[in-house]
């Protein structure tokens, strides 16, 4: 390719076809074993071929690919092509959402999700983007609450516009083995959402008096839910659990590890969906432990939290062990080098960074997580933004605080990829 501009002697139609292929490679995970994995955007390629290569869904895929590669390669020509496609799609999507008589179908939902991902890719420190508008549009089409919890409940209820047949009536984060008491991860996450809302009501408003009985009951409920998650993790079958493939020693060349090189174990998984499910469960436990410690400090400032802090270090360490799997193209080659080069030589597919984005950000914001681990996670987010072409990762890495609904809408859009 020239420094910037279209490749010589290649027609626009072929450039768009290549962009479509790039999207399928970069963002779609087709499950090899459907007993273990739901995949990610796994039904999108057949859908595009059914609807046509110039359909709105196909053009939304191209817009995402042009934007992502334009950012990674510093090619304004590519980002401009993505921008043109994006704006062409906006009008038709808005009309479909505003006019129920047109009959919103699965293709409209998918287009809204993809345009939301486009906004997340194009976001940056000075331009947070408008992905929340597309999350709101998707929620309006599905007639659900505009939140990850609303989407989770729709998947569990078998919403008619949920595309991935493996998810309908089964939930979103399904594993071969239920947890303790037969609870699925989805069930536990719904309870966690309710618990979070209750804790925000009690603890976020200094004008509301705190009563011992309410705080004690909330801590007991939080502790019980943490136990449920422990049981869920222990109940999983060996073929669903991570497998250790290597170990990274501390680098003699760096005071603090670069992205992917936290010293310790390196794990592999069935696929990125399974890795994502595990990290959702881990960060959920970190959130619960953070709340337990916070409540305990109010109820009894002298209480000992050492075991909880050890648990958090172990959970975050397990997330770190999954990061090379998410971020590298060839995990075997990465491990074989054993940190000889303290930089990831061959970045993996952007979908790995996308699935990792929100669990890592949540963990990086929890006071119970040690500062050195928080700093490492911010490095990983910045790396995802730079080398995987997901601009919102840079914003999450550097913004001192991200507005709650902005974050929730991004999480909702990423989770929506499990439904397609």
Curated annotation (Swiss-Prot):
This protein's source sits in the domain of life called Eukaryota
* UniProt function note: Transcription factor that coregulates the expression of the gene cluster that mediates the biosynthesis of the antibiotic 2,4- dihydroxy-3-methyl-6-(2-oxopropyl)benzaldehyde (DHMBA) and its derivatives. Specifically positively regulates the expression of the FAD-dependent oxidoreductase dbaF.
Instruction: Show the InterPro entries listed in the entry.
Output: DHMBA_Reg_Transcription_Factor
Q: What is the lineage of its organism?
A: Eukaryota, Fungi, Dikarya, Ascomycota, Pezizomycotina
Q: Which keywords are on file for this protein?
A: Nucleus, Transcription, Transcription regulation
Induction trigger: Deletion of the conserved eukaryotic csnE deneddylase subunit of the COP9 signalosome leading to defect in protein degradation results in the activation of the silenced dba gene cluster. Expression is positively regulated by the dba cluster specific transcription factor dbaA. Expression is also controlled by the transcription factor flbB.
Q: Name one GO cellular component term.
A: nucleus
Deletion phenotype, per the entry, is:
Reduces the amounts of DHMBA produced and strongly reduces the production of yellow pigmentation.
Localization recorded for this chain is: Nucleus
Organism this protein belongs to? Emericella nidulans (strain FGSC A4 / ATCC 38163 / CBS 112.46 / NRRL 194 / M139)
Q: Which gene encodes it?
A: dbaG
Q: What is this protein called?
A: Transcription factor dbaG
UniProt key word Chloroplast: no
